Amino acid sequence: MAQHTVYFPDAFLTQMREAMPSTLSFDDFLAACQRPLRRSIRVNTLKISVADFLQLTAPYGWTLTPIPWCEEGFWIERDNEDALPLGSTAEHLSGLFYIQEASSMLPVAALFADGNAPQRVMDVAAAPGSKTTQIAARMNNEGAILANEFSASRVKVLHANISRCGISNVALTHFDGRVFGAAVPEMFDAILLDAPCSGEGVVRKDPDALKNWSPESNQEIAATQRELIDSAFHALRPGGTLVYSTCTLNQEENEAVCLWLKETYPDAVEFLPLGDLFPGANKALTEEGFLHVFPQIYDCEGFFVARLRKTQAIPALPAPKYKVGNFPFSPVKDREAGQIRQAAADVGLNWDENLRLWQRDKELWLFPVGIEALIGKVRFSRLGIKLAETHNKGYRWQHEAVIALATPDNVNAFELTPQEAEEWYRGRDVYPQAAPVADDVLVTFQHQPIGLAKRIGSRLKNSYPRELVRDGKLFTGNA
């Protein structure tokens, strides 16, 4: 890969020289920063096993190199990168993988290390969704995740990625992360705080990332990070795990934030060393047991990860003064829920006891049971998955429910050809040579559900959401 010119402020270089361990070469750091970042993906094991994914993609000639800290993660090299963007491949469109930077897979690996199996998890700064979807896969869509995003424009992207990956156990909120300690004290088994930061580690992806860098800005950001980690720590139950991470390299936003928390609650904070997280983790290990990943160590983005345990309760914060408002949903009664479940099963949609039916007017939703304890404490932007809308003739099943709940071995499943699948993703009706018998057709490609169609004569009426419709060149190579 070609070199590219990264902008470095002099004060930043001075700071890095001081921060870099003696075991690392500063010249190697500069050289690594000038190299473009390696592309990487994470297989979505909610949809496909790693072995099956490797078999499916073997004919493409992709070079997939395993990422040591994530069994589902791979660095990827493709000969036809310019001919077809990775995001336009059939496997990406159907949610079989997520394009995710390798080092950003580290925090979730740390969160679930040593057999940790949390049932209620919060991702404090979740967009665009790489870590939320990784957490959901580790939880196998069980339990519940509260995924929060402060930026309103990024909440839509977060939901789109969660939906594409077939995730059903997530509730979305749109708050400043500093509210949660007071709003939901001691409610979570595990919390990921991938904190907003100065982004010093992303120069391989964005050579101008440091154009507005200054030591003063770092100090302001670190002050916000201290408030965020304090809030997250209050929301964590005693015995729970907190992972703090950034994509920056200075110690003020990293080690110092974690040490501040320990100084503030000396009897409640225990640092959990990460030296055994994966083979070679000790190369990035700090004396506190954190991972301070300079880009030359593993040829990835610069990153920082710390894991800690809350060993005992701490004094509560004052209760919030805001009102959440009335919750507009009501649980569906058992008898009606049974009828809905049977109607859904008839078209290939099934769910387990981790999800419960709720209703708002003509809308039917499935909420993760583990999130119900938070109802009335926070206001949700979106909760669970929308299953259907009711109408006179029955139910209008929703696309996100099909992606999350359908299995390809259903009797209504109908496998499309590559050309027909492209037509589907372009929002067009499909005219198969031999039309299926059923009226409600579970449309699949590569034996993966990609939507639900109505059969009208020999035509499959497209229900792919308009906001997801693709144009341009897709996986068959036709524009």
From Swiss-Prot:
Leading EC class: transferase
Highest taxon of the lineage: Bacteria
Principal location listed in the UniProt entry: cytoplasm
Known EC number: 2.1.1.178
Binding site residues for S-adenosyl-L-methionine: 125-131, 149, 176, 194
Tagged with keyword rRNA processing: yes
GO BP terms in the entry: rRNA base methylation
Family of the protein in this entry: Belongs to the class I-like SAM-binding methyltransferase superfamily. RsmB/NOP family.
Summary of the function given for this chain in its UniProt record: Specifically methylates the cytosine at position 1407 (m5C1407) of 16S rRNA.
NCBIfam families xrefs: nop2p (TIGR00446), PRK11933.1 (NF008898)
Name the UniProt record assigns to this protein: Ribosomal RNA small subunit methyltransferase F
